């Protein structure tokens, strides 16, 4: 999965897919009532990027729906996965539940078109703080108490704060997520700073073990050729990047083209792939 980073205006969906992304990451901010408000990152952000692009969340979800609905004039079949980077920093552990519940309702109405031929992309809820596991509980309850519980089949979970893996596993379990139940594990830092791959390798080992909790591992945010090769060598499933075309270039190198390929809609993002 080549994951276009910080896609916060509708026009950027096409921009990043045109560069080779089959996945995008979008920032979500919340108002004082814990309701998702804008697709906005703010400063500081990655080097060589504008930090202040934004849309109203509802408008962005409609644009995303058009890009991921077969038959729509804006449909981009390559775009199969969306990571929502949930800016929960101003939430408390108690308001996190409400925020998750309300965000589920927004997705249901504005992305899934109230269950009637909405967008088809898989969704990953990415939360920076393991103490906000109640966001997941609230999100899941919104669907479990409805006639559309099947939409949870399209939803996965990630904690992005680079916490200890055992603490991350515990937070997922507290949120109601079983081991290997649609779990993506991220590791990374802004592209302005280098970061080693020690925790990435630990996450990959967990993914590949008989008693792990992880389905997929991705690293963020990298675009240097050497860093991309190192990530491939570490066995990641996804790379979040500001320059998808760099990932495509490396993917086409002889050392990697026989081992990796771009994920398509037919590839289940919740299924652990065993590297040979």
UniProtKB/Swiss-Prot annotation:
GO terms, molecular function: lyase activity; metal ion binding; phosphoric diester hydrolase activity; toxin activity
SUPFAM superfamilies named in the record: PLC-like phosphodiesterases
Co-factor requirement: Mg(2+)
Reaction catalysed by this enzyme: an N-(acyl)-sphingosylphosphocholine = an N-(acyl)-sphingosyl-1,3-cyclic phosphate + choline; an N-(acyl)-sphingosylphosphoethanolamine = an N-(acyl)-sphingosyl-1,3-cyclic phosphate + ethanolamine; a 1-acyl-sn-glycero-3-phosphocholine = a 1-acyl-sn-glycero-2,3-cyclic phosphate + choline; a 1-acyl-sn-glycero-3-phosphoethanolamine = a 1-acyl-sn-glycero-2,3-cyclic phosphate + ethanolamine
Tissue: Expressed by the venom gland.
Disulphide linkage map: 45-51, 47-192
One Pfam family per UniProt: GDPD_2
GO annotation, biological process: killing of cells of another organism; lipid catabolic process
Statement: the UniProt record of this protein carries the keyword Iron: no
InterPro entries found in the cross-reference section: PLC-like_Pdiesterase_TIM-brl (IPR017946)
Entry's localization field: Secreted
Enzyme kind, highest EC tier: lyase
Active-site residues annotated for this sequence: 5, 41 (nucleophile)
UniProt-listed Enzyme Commission number(s): 4.6.1.-
Cellular compartments per GO CC: extracellular region
Gene3D superfamilies: Phosphatidylinositol (PI) phosphodiesterase
Keywords, in A-Z order: Cytolysis, Dermonecrotic toxin, Disulfide bond, Hemolysis, Lipid degradation, Lipid metabolism, Lyase, Magnesium, Metal-binding, Secreted, Toxin
Major location (coarse): secreted
Claim: Magnesium is one of the keywords in the record: yes
Cofactor binding comment, as recorded: Binds 1 Mg(2+) ion per subunit.
Function (record text): Dermonecrotic toxins cleave the phosphodiester linkage between the phosphate and headgroup of certain phospholipids (sphingolipid and lysolipid substrates), forming an alcohol (often choline) and a cyclic phosphate. This toxin acts on sphingomyelin (SM). It may also act on ceramide phosphoethanolamine (CPE), lysophosphatidylcholine (LPC) and lysophosphatidylethanolamine (LPE), but not on lysophosphatidylserine (LPS), and lysophosphatidylglycerol (LPG). It acts by transphosphatidylation, releasing exclusively cyclic phosphate products as second products.
Family: Belongs to the arthropod phospholipase D family. Class II subfamily.
Official protein name in the record: Dermonecrotic toxin LlSicTox-alphaIV3
Protein species of origin: Loxosceles laeta (South American recluse spider)
């Amino acid at each position: 999965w080549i994951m276009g980073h910080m896609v916060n205006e509708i026009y950027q969906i096409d921009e990043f897919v045109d560069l080779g992304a089959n996945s995008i990451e979008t920032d979500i901010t919340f108002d004082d009532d814990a309701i998702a408000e804008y697709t906005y990152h703010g400063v500081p952000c990655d080097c060589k990027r504008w930090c202040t692009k934004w849309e109203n969340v509802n408008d962005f979800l409609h644009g995303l729906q058009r890009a991921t609905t077969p038959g729509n004039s804006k449909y981009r079949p390559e775009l199969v996965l969306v990571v929502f980077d949930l800016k929960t920093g101003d939430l408390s552990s108690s308001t996190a539940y409400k925020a998750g519940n309300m965000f589920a309702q927004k997705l249901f109405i504005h992305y899934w078109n109230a269950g009637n031929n909405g967008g088809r992309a898989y969704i990953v809820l990415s939360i920076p703080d393991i103490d906000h596991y109640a966001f997941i509980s609230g999100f899941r309850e919104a669907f479990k108490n409805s006639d559309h519980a099947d939409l949870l089949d399209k939803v996965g979970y990630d904690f992005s704060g680079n916490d200890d893996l055992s603490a991350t596993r515990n937070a997922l379990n507290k949120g109601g997520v079983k081991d290997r139940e649609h779990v993506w594990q991220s590791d990374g830092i802004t592209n302005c700073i280098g970061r080693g791959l020690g925790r990435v390798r630990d996450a990959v080992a967990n993914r590949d073990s008989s008693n792990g909790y992880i389905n997929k591992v991705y690293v963020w945010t990298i675009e240097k050729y050497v860093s991309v090769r190192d990530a491939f060598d570490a066995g990641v499933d996804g790379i979040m990047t500001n320059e998808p075309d760099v990932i495509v270039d490396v993917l086409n190198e002889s050392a990697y083209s026989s081992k990796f390929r771009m994920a398509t809609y037919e590839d289940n993002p919740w299924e652990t792939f065993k590297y040979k």
